Structures are given as structure tokens and as C-alpha cells.
Amino acid sequence: MKVRASVKRICRNCKIIKRSGTIRVICKDARHKQKQG
């Protein structure tokens, strides 16, 4: 899980989701997991 100031999709499988006030990136590649906030 990377915590970043700007979350971006790394590949086309990445999905950007807003969950309880935090913006997250969910992907089948575990290295692409990110969150902001």
C-alpha cells in the first residue's frame, strides 16, 4: 500500500474508489494498491 499525495491508475485494471473519505486504488496487482488521505 502506497500513501500518496496524488493517486493515479498505473494499469488498466486499476480502479479508483472513494471509501469513507479516503481515495483508494484497487487492482489485481497488489503492488498497485494506493491510498490518499
From Swiss-Prot:
User: Taxonomically, what lineage is the organism?
Assistant: Bacteria, Pseudomonadati, Pseudomonadota, Gammaproteobacteria, Legionellales
- Tell me the name of the encoding gene: rpmJ
Asked whether the UniProt record includes Ribonucleoprotein among its keywords, one would answer yes
GO biological process, any:
translation
Q: Output the Gene Ontology cellular-component terms.
A: cytoplasm; ribonucleoprotein complex; ribosome
- Which organism is this entry from? Legionella pneumophila subsp. pneumophila (strain Philadelphia 1 / ATCC 33152 / DSM 7513)
- What family does this belong to? Belongs to the bacterial ribosomal protein bL36 family.
Q: What InterPro entries does the database record attribute to this sequence?
A: Ribosomal_bL36, Ribosomal_bL36_sp
Which UniProt keywords are listed? Ribonucleoprotein, Ribosomal protein
PROSITE patterns given for it?
RIBOSOMAL_L36 (PS00828)
Q: One short Pfam family name for this protein? A: Ribosomal_L36
This chain's protein is named: Large ribosomal subunit protein bL36
Asked if the record carries the keyword Ribonucleoprotein, the reply is yes
Instruction: Give GO MF terms, alphabetically.
Output: structural constituent of ribosome
